[in-house]
């Protein structure tokens, strides 16, 4: 179950009931859920995307010296390490998703149809597949009967895929923005919260732009499914468990990327300190907050 990246969602925990004890699944259950949902792999793609963003920005502006660029790339590799992102997401899921929803999602992902869908989504993650979809997806979507198109649109909406993709883009922009101020004398490093506020209008715009693209992607990715199978998938995503699954994983993703952007600022402050340079005031604030 994907839904972003063109698709992202994941899950779990906290039992409901007046006198029912709070029983929580083990971390192994959450790891299995993240793997089967595709989130495990998707989180490993964030750091390379960050590095690509910095390289593109550097090529346009040459804002950093070669030495500073190398330090920035090392800091990104550390701050956005896949294992660190996975740990944050898993911990957030453990703390916020009801156990019965975790069980329901895992049952779905483990079913024959759930496994088929996961395989389709995994195949769609390759660069070649994405390139083909960008061309064929819109044409396929335009050729679909209205009833099939409506199912695909409902699926994209139920999985919050455009929101998740926009969150990744904005949080990546925040990380790049903070990172590129490294080594630039007199240029303050803005707080993550301030940057989030500044980029919010762009995030809303990204959602608008990404939604039709994701619907076209979904038309292509899920083309092998029959109408009945697609109906079952949409019904699951729109169910109480599926809805919580999507919302909780979106919040967990945002938390993981926000923490990574903060870690990036801290890593760069550490590098400046090791080089014996005086930290800019804003970086001193970041370092103090980290402590």
What does each model-found stretch correspond to?
Residues 1-7:
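Bacterial N-terminal signal peptides that target proteins for export
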Residues 7-15:
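Bacterial N-terminal signal peptides
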Residues 22-129, 264, 278-290:
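N-terminal Sec/ER secretory leader and immediately downstream segment
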Residues 32, 36-43, 73-80, 89-93, ...:
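Second-shell loop/turn segments in exported
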Residues 120, 125-133, 137-140, 144-145, ...:
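Outer-membrane beta-barrel domain signature
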Residues 125-223:
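Extended amphipathic alpha-helical interaction segments
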Residues 196, 204-291:
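A cross-kingdom marker for long, charged
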């Amino acid at each position: 179950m994907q839904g972003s990246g063109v698709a992202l969602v994941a899950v779990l925990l906290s039992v409901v009931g007046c006198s029912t004890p709070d029983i929580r699944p083990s971390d192994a259950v959450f790891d299995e859920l993240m793997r089967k949902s595709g989130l495990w792999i998707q989180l490993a793609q964030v750091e390379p995307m960050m590095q690509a963003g910095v390289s593109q920005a550097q090529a346009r502006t040459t804002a950093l010296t070669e030495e500073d660029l190398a330090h920035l790339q090392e800091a990104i590799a550390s701050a956005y390490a896949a294992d660190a992102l996975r740990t944050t997401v898993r911990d957030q899921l453990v703390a916020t998703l009801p156990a019965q929803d975790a069980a329901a999602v895992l049952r779905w992902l483990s079913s024959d149809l759930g496994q088929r869908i996961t395989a389709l989504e995994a195949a769609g993650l390759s660069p070649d597949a994405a390139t083909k979809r960008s061309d064929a997806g819109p044409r396929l979507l335009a050729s679909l009967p209205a009833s099939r198109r409506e199912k695909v649109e409902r699926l994209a909406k139920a999985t919050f895929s455009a929101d998740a993709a926009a969150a990744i883009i904005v949080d990546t922009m925040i990380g790049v923005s903070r990172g590129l101020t490294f080594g630039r004398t007199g240029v303050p490093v803005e707080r993550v919260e301030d940057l989030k506020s500044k980029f919010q209008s762009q995030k809303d715009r990204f959602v608008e732009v990404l939604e039709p693209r994701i619907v076209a992607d979904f038309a292509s990715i899920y083309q092998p499914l029959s109408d009945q199978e697609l109906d079952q998938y949409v019904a699951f995503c729109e169910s109480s468990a599926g809805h919580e699954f999507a919302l909780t994983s979106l919040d967990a993703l945002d938390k993981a990327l926000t923490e990574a952007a903060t870690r990036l600022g801290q890593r760069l402050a550490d590098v400046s300190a090791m080089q014996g340079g005086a930290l800019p005031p804003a970086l001193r604030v970041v370092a103090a907050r980290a402590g």
